[in-house]
Every structure is written in C-alpha cells, then in structure tokens.
C-alpha cells in the first residue's frame, strides 16, 4: 500500500484489460443483484491503485450489467440495474454515515467496532500507519452518491434511502 499508481498504471501492472475487469464486475452485479454498491474513492484515498481500479470498474459496470445487449460475453445473462452507487470521499451528493450508533443485530456493537475488528484481520495493513477512522482526510464515514436510478438522497445518512 505504500506505492501509488495511476489508474492506467494499475491496470497495466496487473496485466488487466479494462474491458475484462468491467465485464467481471458487471457479471458480479448480475449474479449478486445488489441494489446498492459502496466502494472506494476514485483517487484511491491516499493514491492506492487498486482502490482507483475498484471505483473505476464499479462505475463502468453499472451500465454494462443493465444493458440487455451486453450478453455475448456474460455468464449471467439476466440484466440487473444497480439502484445506487456510493463512492468513498465523493464530494457530490455527500452522505455522512454514523458508524458509532449501536446495532441491535450485532449485540450493541457499532459498525465502527466491527470495521476495526475486520481491519485487524487485514494483516498487510498492520505494518502501516493506516487505521479505521471516522475523521480526518480519509474519514470512512464520508461518501457521495455517484449514481442513482431512484433519485437523490434527502436525509444524507442512509445508503438505502429511496429503496422500497
């Protein structure tokens, strides 16, 4: 994670074609049928190339997954329309999540508690200065609605707003 790659360099270094990555993500959308997708910052937070590629592919794959004409290269042939896409740190249509609210479904633990525990399992990150934080330049509670098929958010604190 110490290295910084442009989006073009990331695809080239891994030997990935954008088309194959977009197709893979579009197939994943069709297979899993998410209403909401939440992903990385388009600038890779601190410049992380894989984060940039994730955000790039997440955006491009929405149209492909929904396109009935985009069948010949897809394993999952039923089109799927993702309803909303949120990007971390995206400045348009901002949303601020409250990760400190206790969740009854998780015995009163907060989303922040769970994220912190999950981050501890990300072994390669334990040798870095990165932490789970809901403040500062990489505030993990800040997102923006980059795409919506169901209208803009009004409450600005709920990824599932406007979904039935």
Give, region by region, the residue ranges found by the protein language model:
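Active-site beta-strand->loop->alpha-helix modules in alpha/beta enzyme cores, enriched
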Residues: 1-71
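The feature marks non-catalytic terminal segments
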Residues: 64-164
């Amino acid at each position: 994670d110490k290295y910084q790659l442009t989006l073009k360099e990331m695809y080239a270094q891994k030997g990935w074609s954008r088309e194959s990555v977009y197709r893979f993500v579009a197939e994943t959308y069709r297979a899993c049928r998410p209403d909401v997708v939440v992903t990385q910052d388009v600038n890779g937070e601190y410049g992380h190339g894989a984060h940039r590629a994730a955000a790039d592919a997440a955006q491009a794959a929405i149209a492909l997954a929904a396109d009935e004409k985009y069948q010949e290269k897809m394993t999952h042939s039923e089109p799927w329309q993702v309803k909303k896409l949120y990007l971390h740190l995206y400045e348009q249509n901002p949303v601020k999540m409250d990760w400190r609210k206790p969740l009854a479904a998780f015995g009163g633990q907060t989303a922040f508690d769970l994220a912190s525990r999950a981050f501890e399992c990300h072994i390669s990150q334990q040798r870095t200065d990165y932490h789970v934080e809901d403040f500062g330049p990489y505030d993990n509670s800040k997102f923006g609605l980059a795409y919506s098929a169901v209208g803009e958010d009004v409450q600005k604190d709920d990824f599932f707003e406007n979904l039935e």
